[in-house]
Every structure is written in structure tokens, then in C-alpha cells.
């Protein structure tokens, strides 16, 4: 038998995250990941709106 019966249980406390010392390489890697995520988000938005993924496509010449 537990001392708590019914009601809402309190959430467990989590330890505070320690601040890590980041190298310049780590900072550059995180910025690259952010840029890739932003580019992917923009690409997905273009796909949803129906825009073509590539600009070229098949070019038809006027000559026969």
C-alpha cells in the first residue's frame, strides 16, 4: 500500500544540465546542422505549395 492514493502524482525532478565547453568545430557543426534543417524546411514548403523542385526541366527547341 502506498501513502498516495488517487490524485495527481508529482513529476520527478530532473538534474540540471551542465554547460559544456564547446570547441570551434562543435559550434561550426551545430550551425551547419541548423542551416541544413532550414534548407530542408524550405524545400518541404516548396513541395507542399506545388513548385517544381528543379528549375531546368526539359527544354524544347523551336527547330524540328
UniProtKB/Swiss-Prot annotation:
InterPro entries linked: TMA7 (IPR015157)
Subcellular location(s): the record lists: Cytoplasm; Nucleus
A cellular component term, taken from the record's GO annotations: nucleus
Q: Name the GO terms of the biological process aspect.
A: cytoplasmic translation
Output the superkingdom of the source species.
Answer: Eukaryota
User: Which UniProt keyword terms apply here?
Assistant: Cytoplasm, Nucleus, Protein biosynthesis
Coiled-coil residues? none
- Chief subcellular location equals cytoplasm
The record's region (Disordered) falls at 1-38, 45-64
| Stored Pfam families | TMA7
Give the record's subunit note.
Interacts with the 40S ribosomal subunit.
Its function, per the record, reads: Involved in protein synthesis.
Family statement drawn from the similarity comment of this UniProt entry: Belongs to the TMA7 family.
Q: What else is known?
A: Present with 3100 molecules/cell in log phase SD medium.
Name of the protein in question: Translation machinery-associated protein 7
Q: Which organism is it from?
A: Saccharomyces cerevisiae (strain ATCC 204508 / S288c) (Baker's yeast)
Amino acid at each position: 500500500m502506498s501513502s498516495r492514493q488517487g490524485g495527481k502524482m508529482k513529476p520527478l525532478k530532473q538534474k540540471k544540465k551542465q554547460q559544456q565547453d564547446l570547441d570551434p568545430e562543435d559550434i561550426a557543426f551545430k550551425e551547419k546542422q541548423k542551416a541544413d534543417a532550414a534548407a530542408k524546411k524550405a524545400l518541404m514548403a516548396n513541395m507542399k505549395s506545388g513548385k517544381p523542385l528543379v528549375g531546368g526541366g526539359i527544354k524544347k527547341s523551336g527547330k524540328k
